[in-house]
Amino acid sequence: MRAHDDEFNATVNKIHLNKVKPPKVVVAGIPQGSGRMHGKDWMPDPQDQQTGATELSNEEIARQLELRFGSLQDGIYAKMVEKVGDRLYWENWAREIGLIAQKFIERIARVVKEGLHKEAFVEFLNGLQKNLNPSIDEGQAVEMLAQHMITRPVFDALFKDYQFVKNNAVSRSMQRMLELLESEAMEKDTEVLNKFYENVRMNVGDIDNLEGKQTLIKNLYEKFFKGAFPKTVDKLGIVYTPVECVDFIIHSVDDILRKEFDCSLSDENVHILDPFTGTGTFITRLLQSGLIRPEDLERKYKNEIHCNELVLLAYYIADVNIESVFHSLVKRDTYLPFEGICLTDTFQTTENEENVLDQTWFPENAANVDKQKKAPVRVIMGNPPYSVGQKSANDNAQNLSYAHLDKRIAETYAKAAQATNKNSLYDSYIKAFRWASDRIADCKDGGVVAFISNGAWIDGNAQEGFRKCLEDEYSSIYVLNLRGNQRTSGELSRKEGGKIFGSGSRTPISITLLVKNPAKKGKATIYYHDIGDYLSREQKLKKISEFGSVDSSELQWEIVAPNEKGDWINQRGGIFDSLIILGDKEDKNNKQVVFVPFYSRGLATARDAWCYNSSSESLNANIKRSMDFYNDQRYQLSKGFIKDVEYDLTQISWTTSVLNLALKNQEITQDKIGEKVISLYRPFFKQIGYYSRFWNERVYQLPKLFPTSKYKNLVICVKGIGDKDFSCLIADCIPDLQVIFNGQCFPLYWYEENKNKQQTLSLFDTESSDDYIRRDGITDWILKEVRTRFGNARKITKETIFYYVYGLLHSPKYREAFAADLKKSLPRIPIVEDIDAFLDFSYAGKQLANLHLNYEEIPAYEGVTVIGDRQKEEAPDGRMIAGTTDLYAVKVDYKYYEVEKMRFPKKGQKDTIIYNSSIRIENIPDEAYEYIVNGKSAIEWIMERYQVKTDPSSLIKNDPNDWSREHDNPRYILDLLLSVINVSVQTMEIVKKLPDLKLE
């Protein structure tokens, strides 16, 4: 029936949203006796009642059965939606609306470009720029009109009584512009629009309760936006805040107001602002919370509750949500629009105090913004935008800059920070804290800022200045760390637990309440609580709900005393600073370091799918295709045929540097600007890489370490600054930036260009051995220092020190003692007191280096069993011990050894790996998984990386089996896995025998 009747299909999928069940779907039964049964009309037949039954009146029996049957009906309806309904119904409908929105955008763009009302549209655009942000362009204005066209019929159908389009100030302005444009609409356009409106009425009409309407709007908002306007989502970090978190914040604010200021959210002149309201959840939950006394509700609604939203669709949804909740709570004869909501960019409102808002197209909205700016706001709460900038130029979704706000950050957070890289201080959520802090400072009586936000600031190295300023600017600070950092991996990721925003955000999340009480002087008292390890999202939300407020007796607050470095948690100790720094680029004259200042970050291509591949042939083709497209776009730009490049991710991955090359009309060709090299892309996973100053976004100082593929070197890659656990790995080829998280590479040698080289090239030579001069990466100072400590021991060389560093960095005691320091700075090295211990560390480092560099040549671990159908011809039981000659005698072919994706038989069973449909590896020892590098075991790196993958953006396929084919070794991947198992076991054997490290 659903397949043949769209209206019935919509009815079934609306059942769970409605309280009154649809007449088209009746749940009824037929009794065995003569009684009637149709819904609640069933009455038992006296002849069917057994003798000796409890004496109850027919009316009582009927009442009880009615209750039971009503419960049964609800259960059947729920199952009907689950079993018969389409789980993807609303998601698919949102996707369809997204496609329609794109058609609307194309239609409007055509009309405003060529139509009679072009001048009116320019005035309209000017109004948006004045009300929202000067950066609003024509395309964004067209998008907003399309959003209005989508929103209008949905709200008309859902909220028939509120006449939203007529009552909302911004909606009226949008409708006025659209009516001008619709006068030029073609018949085909009108037909499409009418069909869409009819579809909306069928899908969202007849929902009979406020909760169901809000659920539908929330789902539509999230799914529609992700599908129709992904760049808007990326730019603003649009996510929906769980109500458990919202309620916790609202009740916490009320409790703090009572405790600190002897007032409440309900009191007169306590103005409340949600500067990033989204769909209005904070305001609607505030109205429904019961914290505002009934007699105060209308006053609050009319005068003391304010909110802003930048995205038109979210603004509409917020307004209609707030108005509908208010009218459900306050019974009025007349409709009262909510004038506290503004369509505006919160950050922009304080950029220029003299800025005159648009009075032509958006006069009422402008008046509301002015009214809000004059209000003595005492409470600021909400969910600030999460976005931390576009990932690449392809996104074409740059975050906006705000001169005044950025200046305030520079004067405060950045000035107080010691970190070199301060870019993250300009992330949107940090800007929100700065803006709110300045806004609340305007209220002489003090106030509260309460945000749920990205929680990376709590322990981030770059946010040290931010933390120091919070401590100085507020009297009390409450931080509930909800964790959930899914930019980690392995055990650390599991400890972080579920993501509060589900798939909406991978960052850690925190709830922060900042209290500014003028009566309290000195630095803030900091209250901190960690939600706990290994909790799912549902468990976290349950705990937050149980807490209810910061004043809950269930919440055990820890008083934090920051150290001099600005650490609140995971505080660094004092010993680390007394150790010898690996390298110092800030002070290149500092000689008391281990390495010269030519260490480098790993290769950052910003277009990995294009610049790396398992196949040399595929890499050639990919590079050629992207460069051909680049040169075509460059040429068209230079001739004025196009104004901007085409952002087609299947042709090229644009970055800032490559865009600049195109703007300069610089032609590039594959052979002239780079070369193919072997690169270590991830631990124990080599790729063919394209190495180029032009086509790689950042090569850093790698050309000094690996000038070309001809020059050999060893580098120790250590984890860069960040919240991942420390690890390191040695490499003898160009390492990717993420072979170790944000890796810094410390070299045994570096190469200096020989400017006085002799020109002795023959006709067939391409490069002279005199092009570069090899220099030592280890400093003369550290060599002298170590030798002096050990009685001028001449047997200690720079190479000895290099391997000492590698051995020491594997010491479990070193990693444990300095875990907090290693997240916030590069390693520092102690020199052990005893020469024998020093040499033992160095020898162990050399052993580890041999394993980690020559891992492909290490034989399989004895005892690991390989099972495969082919081996049955060689052994009756189908089993052969890895490493025996019989295994290699088996006739091979590439198809047999191909891998699609390796896996474990089931979760938690790691002694066996299913290699492919024919081959299985068993008896893998537990200790093989103890070797963790860059967040996961070496074995699991092989399993993750050696699988056939297609990049979702470029659609480039990377097949690791191509490496086997091009290296004439069909067994390469299988042998590699067997080798890495042994490498892992041997690594841990060496690590466990390292000398004891005394760190007094």
Which ranges hold each PLM region?
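Extended, well-ordered alpha-helical scaffold/bundle regions in very large, multi-domain proteins
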Residues: 149, 162-194, 271-283, 301, ...
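Sequence-level detector for compositionally biased, low-complexity segments
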Residues: 394, 419, 435-1000
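Active-site-adjacent bridging/hinge elements
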Residues: 117-131, 216-231, 290-298, 352-356, ...
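SAM-dependent methyltransferase catalytic-core segment centered on the flexible catalytic loop
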Residues: 281-300, 349-451, 456-463, 467-480, ...
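Long, K/E/R/D-enriched contiguous segments that form extended
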Residues: 205-249, 258, 263-272, 305, ...
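Extended, hydrophobic alpha-helical segments in both membrane/secreted and soluble proteins
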Residues: 232, 241-257, 271-286, 314, ...
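Charged, often flexible domain-edge or linker segments that flank or initiate folded functional domains
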Residues: 10-190, 239-372, 478-482, 500, ...
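Class I S-adenosyl-L-methionine
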Residues: 162-171, 175-261, 575-587, 591-612, ...
